[in-house]
Amino acid sequence: MMRWPPCSRPLLGVCTLLSLALLGHILLHDLEVVPRELRGFSQDEIHQACQPGASSPECRGSPRAAPTQCDLPPNSRFDCAPDKGITPQQCEARGCCYMPAEWPPDAQMGQPWCFFPPSYPSYRLENLTTTETGYTATLTRAVPTFFPKDIMTLRLDMLMETESRLHFTIKDPANRRYEVPLETPRVYSQAPFTLYSVEFSEEPFGVVVRRKLDGRVLLNTTVAPLFFADQFLQLSTSLPSQHITGLAEHLGSLMLSTNWTKITLWNRDIAPEPNVNLYGSHPFYLVLEDGGLAHGVFLLNSNAMDVVLQPSPALSWRSTGGILDVYIFLGPEPKSVVQQYLDVVGYPFMPPYWGLGFHLCRWGYSTSAITRQVVENMTRAYFPLDVQWNDLDYMDARRDFTFNKDHFGDFPAMVQELHQGGRRYIMIVDPAISSSGPAGTYRPYDEGLRRGVFITNETGQPLIGQVWPGLTAFPDFTNPETLDWWQDMVTEFHAQVPFDGMWIDMNEPSNFVRGSVDGCPDNSLENPPYLPGVVGGTLRAATICASSHQFLSTHYDLHNLYGLTEALASHRALVKARGMRPFVISRSTFAGHGRYSGHWTGDVWSNWEQLSYSVPEILLFNLLGVPLVGADICGFLGNTSEELCVRWTQLGAFYPFMRNHNALNSQPQEPYRFSETAQQAMRKAFTLRYVLLPYLYTLFHRAHVRGETVARPLFLEFPEDPSTWTVDRQLLWGEALLITPVLEAEKVEVTGYFPQGTWYDLQTVPMEAFGSLPPPAPLTSVIHSKGQWVTLSAPLDTINVHLRAGHIIPMQGPALTTTESRKQHMALAVALTASGEAQGELFWDDGESLGVLDGGDYTQLIFLAKNNTFVNKLVHVSSEGASLQLRNVTVLGVATAPQQVLCNSVPVSNFTFSPDTETLAIPVSLTMGEQFVISWS
């Protein structure tokens, strides 16, 4: 039996979802009456289709009359046999059309041979009623489908929540069904003005959502029948464009193919490869429309599902349970779509400053002595290192919250030494808890058993699987008692070993046996009538039984939330244990994950293909509100090469989360392992990242408080330029920096797209003033682009980074840790537009405290340049950041040599001007938290 918690549980923001629906004939919300031929089968046809007593699953309530209107174009067909292959006779028994079609070139799946006719019976819209927040209606079905346990009467609630957000649910009014326990906004009145209009088809039921601005149809569910059976829900819609992204996690291009593509969402432990379900599930997509417009759609459903894309273009959601809970975001531009999505699922957490430094790990640092030596080697080679990690090696028998007294006997002292050196420490923590020891020998299991925190099997006993420590039980993080138990375990272990963050792995959850060591029951949860395209051919492949019981529901419903709920528990536990900003990196994710944790992209291979694929992966997770994301630099599986590792380090310097990690028995790949030439190239990339950390930290602040992205695709900034829509091997940091990495072997040039505007090579900024880099070789210092592809020089020691005209970025002298770099002098790079304008921002606090915004313990500055004058605007100043010392202002785009430079009305005599690069370098001695004015003439 499912155990339902009271509505007051902290995660149950949707426990009592707001219920409203759209009705026609009011304002712009017109109820369309569809033509007679589209209304479905007549009662006579229904009677002829299925005589009383018919029991065949192909006939159960389904019309047998030969369908008409089967002359649909192949790309506009919607599959009438999603569950299995069927014969022409079985297809017609379902009331569908059968017509063979060729497999399209380069398609992942074929066009359906058995497909719905336009007249296929669906639901009918009835009892339309106006409510305070929108409208409500009843949906009734007269003819059952070919799936068991159809729900014949449904309730439609539609909420016009905001100007740009429309929300509707379809659910069973008679029986409570599982709903995702994600806290979402509540509204109590209808938005007075909207960017959308809504129309309805009465029979067959359908919803059409249009953008008022141009009348474009964004959502049209009339293209295929609605299914709502107990274990099969299908909602299809047309798409206004083939340019669609989202629906993570998958390995591939940022833009999805609409050429018959199926994306499966069921979190799975598997090394990333194309066309398989990976570690996370994010049922959200964003569509780019003509004219720079965009919209997004979010299906708040955590059950196993397929999402099918077809060339018409159209999309079909196929879920195995829950309800249909749909949000539509009107933008109107892509940036706003992302922010509106994050308004629903939550803005990202603010990471500690040190978390943006370099992290180093590998599976195989088998002793504390080896771990110490790695840190020492990094220091001797003059490579920055902020956070040292350990994999399973530190554990006693690979059990959580223990350490090996033989190989890590001085583990607590080692961590203290890292702290004394200005560094931090993170270790792996898997969710599975060893269950095989004698009672009283392993406190996490003993306490968990006593407190009832584990997922249970059909007998009510803890489900036992097998993971790294052997036999294991799995904590149920939807149980409030489990959150408290996890907090206790984390706090107790932290009292022994003062770690600084948690790396939560294997949390799909991963299991080395199918389901459990005792197998799984033979029931409809284990063998659903519709099985999405999961790797392994069963829901229990590499995980636990779908029918196992959790506090909120069955694992069948909650599987995709496991990583999210563990991230929340770990986030909360770290706050309790440390009293400072938590740092959690998780492998498994779901919508809203960025509120609690970052993500790394899993067990990637050390090859050029996976290096290249990491760029769209980083971009996609930023669109999904998980900006703290990165891939294992140099690759995890297999052996890297020197050139690959150099290029990966250069790109990795621009991952929001920068970590080098590799597998047991792989060749070592720490930066100091390579030739001096390679080391110097890597050192330049490290230096560049550390110099730019103030800008990166400011971007994370903006993501945290405004729902912005950190790393972002070009189309987010330039949506009106269609050439940017498919660019996914370059990335932007915020609005200002364009990174064009080398992603292929043996290349000394790289071609990138430069949107319209002026772009300054960042190497023309005199960072040698920091004493860290030699002056750059002569380069093409500025690109005046009309929107074009540009081939750039990219020798092995170079990653191309360009600063966009109109922007100002803060920089700081580098060091081997952020503890030291935060003490260095600041600099500002000012990139002028043709009209001589630019602006930028700096956010600064102590880098790790909680509640700095509420307490006012931060400094926020706005920088403005106009009319040959540069000023700082003091938005908020506190002791944190007020005393930062500014030593250099570099102005790019100064066309003529200045005769005079003034700083606070005092002449600056030692400024320099380079006519070749149009660069004005102004040495200053200023305090950032005090008003200043710099001018040149």
UniProtKB/Swiss-Prot annotation:
Catalytic activity field: Hydrolysis of terminal, non-reducing (1->4)-linked alpha-D-glucose residues with release of alpha-D-glucose
Disulfides per UniProt: C70-C97, C80-C96, C91-C114, C520-C545, C634-C645
Span of the signal peptide: 1-23
Subcellular location(s) per record: Lysosome; Lysosome membrane
SUPFAM superfamilies: (Trans)glycosidases, Galactose mutarotase-like, Glycosyl hydrolase domain, Trefoil
GO MF assignments: alpha-1,4-glucosidase activity; carbohydrate binding
P-type domain boundaries: 68-118
Binding site for substrate: D391, R587, D603, H661
Propeptide: 24-60
Main location, first listed in the record: other
Keywords: Disulfide bond, Glycoprotein, Glycosidase, Hydrolase, Lysosome, Membrane, Signal
Gene Ontology biological-process entries: glycogen catabolic process; lysosome organization
Gene3D superfamilies linked to this entry: Glycosidases, glycosyl hydrolase (family 31), Golgi alpha-mannosidase II, Spasmolytic Protein, domain 1
Any Gene Ontology CC annotation: lysosomal membrane
CDD domains on file: GH31_MGAM_SI_GAA (cd06602), GH31_N (cd14752), Trefoil (cd00111)
Enzyme Commission (EC) number: 3.2.1.20
Root EC class: hydrolase
Glycan-linked positions: N127, N220, N259, N377, N457, N639, N867, N888, N910
A matching Pfam family: Glyco_hydro_31_3rd
Similarity remark: Belongs to the glycosyl hydrolase 31 family.
Job description of the protein: Essential for the degradation of glycogen in lysosomes. Has highest activity on alpha-1,4-linked glycosidic linkages, but can also hydrolyze alpha-1,6-linked glucans.
PANTHER family (UniProt xref): ALPHA-GLUCOSIDASE, LYSOSOMAL ALPHA-GLUCOSIDASE
Disease: Defects in GAA are the cause of generalized glycogenosis. It is characterized by a accumulation of glycogen within lysosomes. This disease has been reported in Brahman and Shorthorn breeds. Its most common clinical representation is a failure to thrive, progressive muscular weakness and an un-coordinated gait.
Protein name as catalogued: Lysosomal alpha-glucosidase
Organism: Bos taurus
Gene: GAA
